[in-house]
Design a protein with these regions (language model features):
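Conserved histidine-centered catalytic loops in small-molecule metabolism enzymes
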Residues: 35-65, 90, 146, 169-193
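Short beta-strand scaffold positions
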Residues: 41-42, 111, 135-136
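Active-site-proximal alpha-helix that buttresses catalytic centers in soluble enzyme cores
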Residues: 1-58
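Short hydrophobic/aromatic-enriched beta-strand-loop microsegments
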Residues: 20, 58-65, 152-161
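Phosphate-handling substructures
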Residues: 54-112
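Short active-site segment of divalent metal-dependent hydrolases/proteases
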Residues: 5, 140-141
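Generic beta-sheet signal
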Residues: 37, 128-138
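Domain-level recognition of soluble alpha/beta enzyme cores
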Residues: 151-178
Protein backbone atom coordinates (compact mmCIF):
# COMPACT_ATOMS: atom_id res chain seq x y z
CA UNK A 1 0.00 0.00 0.00
CA UNK A 2 1.17 3.53 -0.73
CA UNK A 3 2.61 5.79 1.96
CA UNK A 4 0.75 8.35 4.04
CA UNK A 5 -1.05 11.27 2.39
CA UNK A 6 -2.69 14.32 3.94
CA UNK A 7 -6.06 12.73 3.12
CA UNK A 8 -5.07 9.59 5.06
CA UNK A 9 -4.03 11.71 8.03
CA UNK A 10 -7.34 13.61 7.89
CA UNK A 11 -9.34 10.37 7.34
CA UNK A 12 -10.71 11.65 4.03
CA UNK A 13 -11.90 9.41 1.24
CA UNK A 14 -9.22 9.70 -1.47
CA UNK A 15 -10.57 7.25 -3.98
CA UNK A 16 -9.32 8.17 -7.42
CA UNK A 17 -8.23 11.70 -6.58
CA UNK A 18 -4.56 12.11 -7.38
CA UNK A 19 -3.33 13.00 -3.89
CA UNK A 20 0.46 12.97 -3.35
CA UNK A 21 2.31 11.70 -0.31
CA UNK A 22 2.52 14.28 2.45
CA UNK A 23 5.99 15.28 3.69
CA UNK A 24 5.61 13.08 6.79
CA UNK A 25 4.48 10.17 4.61
CA UNK A 26 7.51 10.45 2.37
CA UNK A 27 9.89 10.93 5.33
CA UNK A 28 8.70 7.80 7.12
CA UNK A 29 9.29 5.45 4.15
CA UNK A 30 12.35 3.22 3.93
CA UNK A 31 13.78 1.18 1.11
CA UNK A 32 12.35 -2.34 0.88
CA UNK A 33 14.52 -5.39 1.42
CA UNK A 34 13.96 -6.76 -2.08
CA UNK A 35 14.98 -5.46 -5.49
CA UNK A 36 12.42 -6.33 -8.17
CA UNK A 37 13.08 -5.34 -11.78
CA UNK A 38 9.45 -4.27 -12.19
CA UNK A 39 6.86 -2.87 -9.79
CA UNK A 40 3.22 -2.56 -10.81
CA UNK A 41 1.61 0.68 -9.65
CA UNK A 42 -1.52 2.67 -10.44
CA UNK A 43 -1.73 5.94 -12.37
CA UNK A 44 -2.16 7.83 -9.07
CA UNK A 45 1.01 9.66 -7.99
CA UNK A 46 0.96 8.36 -4.43
CA UNK A 47 1.78 4.84 -5.65
CA UNK A 48 4.58 6.08 -7.92
CA UNK A 49 6.08 8.24 -5.16
CA UNK A 50 6.02 5.33 -2.72
CA UNK A 51 7.51 2.89 -5.24
CA UNK A 52 10.36 5.30 -6.04
CA UNK A 53 11.44 5.22 -2.38
CA UNK A 54 10.78 1.55 -1.63
CA UNK A 55 12.14 0.15 -4.90
CA UNK A 56 14.63 2.66 -6.37
CA UNK A 57 15.65 1.82 -9.91
CA UNK A 58 12.73 -0.53 -10.56
CA UNK A 59 10.76 -0.13 -13.78
CA UNK A 60 7.31 1.18 -12.78
CA UNK A 61 4.36 -0.09 -14.82
CA UNK A 62 0.94 1.51 -14.39
CA UNK A 63 -2.12 -0.74 -14.23
CA UNK A 64 -5.25 1.42 -14.32
CA UNK A 65 -7.62 -1.27 -13.03
CA UNK A 66 -5.67 -1.56 -9.77
CA UNK A 67 -6.76 1.99 -8.83
CA UNK A 68 -8.61 2.62 -5.61
CA UNK A 69 -12.40 2.51 -5.55
CA UNK A 70 -14.16 5.55 -6.98
CA UNK A 71 -16.03 7.01 -4.00
CA UNK A 72 -17.76 9.61 -6.19
CA UNK A 73 -19.16 12.57 -4.27
CA UNK A 74 -17.65 11.23 -1.02
CA UNK A 75 -14.09 11.84 -2.24
CA UNK A 76 -12.27 14.63 -0.46
CA UNK A 77 -14.61 14.45 2.53
CA UNK A 78 -14.41 12.65 5.86
CA UNK A 79 -17.00 11.12 8.18
CA UNK A 80 -17.38 14.25 10.30
CA UNK A 81 -18.21 16.32 7.23
CA UNK A 82 -20.77 13.75 6.07
CA UNK A 83 -22.30 12.57 9.34
CA UNK A 84 -25.64 14.13 8.37
CA UNK A 85 -25.44 13.47 4.62
CA UNK A 86 -28.35 11.10 3.79
CA UNK A 87 -26.50 9.55 0.82
CA UNK A 88 -23.47 8.80 2.97
CA UNK A 89 -25.53 7.42 5.85
CA UNK A 90 -27.48 5.18 3.46
CA UNK A 91 -24.21 3.88 2.00
CA UNK A 92 -22.70 3.19 5.44
CA UNK A 93 -25.92 1.55 6.66
CA UNK A 94 -25.79 -0.74 3.61
CA UNK A 95 -22.33 -1.92 4.77
CA UNK A 96 -20.78 0.20 1.99
CA UNK A 97 -22.18 -2.24 -0.58
CA UNK A 98 -24.50 0.17 -2.41
CA UNK A 99 -23.18 2.56 -5.06
CA UNK A 100 -21.51 5.77 -3.98
CA UNK A 101 -23.22 8.72 -5.70
CA UNK A 102 -21.26 9.22 -8.95
CA UNK A 103 -18.96 6.36 -7.90
CA UNK A 104 -18.60 2.58 -7.89
CA UNK A 105 -20.14 -0.19 -5.86
CA UNK A 106 -17.77 -2.30 -3.81
CA UNK A 107 -18.72 -5.31 -5.97
CA UNK A 108 -17.84 -3.57 -9.26
CA UNK A 109 -14.62 -2.21 -7.76
CA UNK A 110 -13.59 -5.61 -6.36
CA UNK A 111 -14.27 -7.35 -9.66
CA UNK A 112 -12.21 -4.76 -11.56
CA UNK A 113 -9.27 -5.09 -9.16
CA UNK A 114 -9.38 -8.89 -8.93
CA UNK A 115 -9.47 -9.29 -12.71
CA UNK A 116 -6.36 -7.08 -13.08
CA UNK A 117 -4.61 -8.71 -10.11
CA UNK A 118 -5.25 -12.25 -11.41
CA UNK A 119 -3.96 -11.29 -14.87
CA UNK A 120 -0.69 -10.07 -13.32
CA UNK A 121 -0.28 -13.27 -11.28
CA UNK A 122 -1.06 -15.42 -14.34
CA UNK A 123 1.46 -13.52 -16.46
CA UNK A 124 4.18 -13.65 -13.80
CA UNK A 125 3.78 -17.42 -13.43
CA UNK A 126 3.67 -17.98 -17.20
CA UNK A 127 6.86 -15.93 -17.60
CA UNK A 128 8.61 -17.81 -14.77
CA UNK A 129 8.99 -14.68 -12.65
CA UNK A 130 10.27 -15.32 -9.12
CA UNK A 131 8.69 -12.20 -7.65
CA UNK A 132 5.66 -10.06 -8.44
CA UNK A 133 5.46 -6.69 -6.68
CA UNK A 134 2.28 -4.63 -6.75
CA UNK A 135 2.14 -1.27 -4.98
CA UNK A 136 -1.41 0.04 -4.93
CA UNK A 137 -4.09 1.15 -2.46
CA UNK A 138 -5.81 -0.06 0.70
CA UNK A 139 -8.98 -0.97 -1.15
CA UNK A 140 -6.98 -2.77 -3.83
CA UNK A 141 -5.29 -4.89 -1.17
CA UNK A 142 -8.55 -5.65 0.59
CA UNK A 143 -10.33 -6.72 -2.60
CA UNK A 144 -7.54 -9.00 -3.82
CA UNK A 145 -6.80 -10.50 -0.41
CA UNK A 146 -10.46 -11.20 0.37
CA UNK A 147 -10.84 -13.06 -2.92
CA UNK A 148 -7.52 -14.93 -3.15
CA UNK A 149 -5.70 -15.10 0.21
CA UNK A 150 -5.49 -18.04 2.58
CA UNK A 151 -6.36 -18.03 5.38
CA UNK A 152 -9.70 -16.60 4.28
CA UNK A 153 -10.82 -13.38 5.96
CA UNK A 154 -13.31 -10.68 5.12
CA UNK A 155 -12.55 -7.54 3.12
CA UNK A 156 -11.92 -5.17 6.03
CA UNK A 157 -9.58 -7.61 7.80
CA UNK A 158 -7.03 -7.01 5.04
CA UNK A 159 -6.68 -3.23 5.49
CA UNK A 160 -2.92 -2.81 5.93
CA UNK A 161 -1.47 0.45 7.26
CA UNK A 162 0.14 2.92 4.89
CA UNK A 163 3.38 1.48 3.44
CA UNK A 164 2.25 -1.96 4.61
CA UNK A 165 1.50 -5.09 2.66
CA UNK A 166 1.63 -8.84 2.36
CA UNK A 167 4.06 -11.47 1.09
CA UNK A 168 2.18 -14.31 -0.56
CA UNK A 169 3.07 -17.71 -2.02
CA UNK A 170 1.53 -18.59 -5.40
CA UNK A 171 2.31 -22.32 -5.30
CA UNK A 172 -1.37 -23.30 -5.51
CA UNK A 173 -2.46 -20.50 -7.84
CA UNK A 174 -2.62 -22.51 -11.08
CA UNK A 175 -4.89 -25.21 -9.67
CA UNK A 176 -6.84 -23.44 -6.90
CA UNK A 177 -6.57 -19.67 -7.61
CA UNK A 178 -5.38 -19.05 -4.03
CA UNK A 179 -2.35 -17.35 -2.51
CA UNK A 180 -0.96 -18.39 0.86
CA UNK A 181 -0.09 -15.60 3.29
CA UNK A 182 3.55 -15.88 4.35
CA UNK A 183 3.98 -12.63 6.27
CA UNK A 184 3.01 -9.00 6.56
CA UNK A 185 5.51 -6.25 5.78
CA UNK A 186 5.78 -2.63 6.85
CA UNK A 187 8.16 -0.31 5.01
CA UNK A 188 8.43 2.58 7.43
CA UNK A 189 11.54 3.63 9.30
CA UNK A 190 9.87 2.93 12.66
CA UNK A 191 9.35 -0.71 11.68
CA UNK A 192 12.98 -1.12 10.61
CA UNK A 193 14.25 -0.76 14.17
Amino acid sequence: RHGLTAYNAEKRYQGQRDIPLCPAGRAQLRQADLWPETVYITPLCRTRQTAEVLFPGARLVEVKDLQEMCFGSFEGRNFIEMEHDPDYLAWVNANCESPCPDGETKAVFSERVCRAFAALVDRALADGEETLVILAHGGTQMAAMERYALPHADYYHWCAPNAGGYVLDAGDWAEQRVLHLLKTVQYTKEEAR
